[in-house]
């Protein structure tokens, strides 16, 4: 079965009740509407993919090259463009057509999805917050080293700092994917997905919701 995907906006979290009157924490995602602006096929492009556009934007804010792409597809400019890769044995031309509109209804209640977004930026962070280091002693002679990382390498051996050594630095603002989340409810009337659990990113951030690659749909 071909993987489905849609661009959307994270609106925030809330809680609902299931059929057993148990509280279920859900994230509300405004899914679509998306419009197909380009189709890539294995024969022509060497891989199979579909390009989706999402979000309102004033046409005067779109540069000429991108405006030309939308004009070729015969659709109004959108704020976001994303290309979703399909399996090589899946014919994008048979599954989609340029100008086709995708809504939240491409998913069903109980489906499992992978959600990709940009995590919240935390700014410059130390090793205890960024990597979960224990830190050093609070007493017994410890002098102003309580939150320091400690040694990052020997003097003579190895005589250098290994690549990838965990240190302080900018934390967050990374592309993160949370896998195997269950779609609790599809609200087709409002174009909203209620996804069980938390998803990456801030409220109002762009997310990509795709069929779970490891588990598949229910």
Curated annotation (Swiss-Prot):
Signal sequence coordinates: none
Record Gene3D superfamilies: 3.30.160.810, Translation factors
Cellular component, GO annotation: cytosolic large ribosomal subunit
One GO BP: translation
Pfam (any one): Ribosomal_L3
InterPro entries xref list: Ribosomal_uL3, Ribosomal_uL3_bac/org-type, Ribosomal_uL3_CS, Transl_B-barrel_sf
Complex formation: Part of the 50S ribosomal subunit. Forms a cluster with proteins L14 and L19.
NCBIfam families: L3_bact
Family of the protein in this entry: Belongs to the universal ribosomal protein uL3 family.
UniProt-recorded name of the protein: Large ribosomal subunit protein uL3
């Amino acid at each position: 079965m071909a993987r489905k995907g849609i661009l959307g906006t994270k609106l925030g979290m809330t809680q609902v009740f299931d059929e057993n009157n148990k509280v279920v924490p859900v994230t509300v995602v405004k899914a679509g509407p998306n419009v197909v602006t380009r189709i890539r096929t294995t024969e022509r492009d060497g891989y199979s993919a579909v390009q989706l556009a999402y979000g309102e934007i004033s046409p005067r804010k779109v540069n000429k090259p991108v405006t030309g792409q939308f004009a070729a597809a015969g659709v109004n400019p959108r704020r976001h463009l994303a290309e979703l890769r399909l399996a090589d044995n899946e014919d994008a031309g048979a599954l989609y057509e340029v100008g086709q509109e995708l809504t939240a209804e491409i998913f069903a209640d109980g489906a499992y999805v992978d959600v990709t977004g940009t995590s919240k930026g935390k700014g410059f962070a130390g090793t205890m917050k960024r990597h979960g280091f224990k830190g050093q002693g609070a007493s017994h002679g410890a002098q102003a080293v309580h939150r320091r990382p400690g040694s990052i390498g020997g003097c003579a051996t190895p005589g250098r700092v290994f690549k990838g050594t965990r240190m302080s630095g900018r934390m967050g603002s990374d592309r993160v994917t949370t896998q195997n989340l269950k779609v609790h409810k599809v609200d087709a009337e409002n174009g909203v997905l209620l996804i069980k659990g938390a998803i990456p990113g801030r409220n109002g951030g762009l997310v990509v919701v795709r069929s779970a690659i490891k588990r598949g749909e229910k």
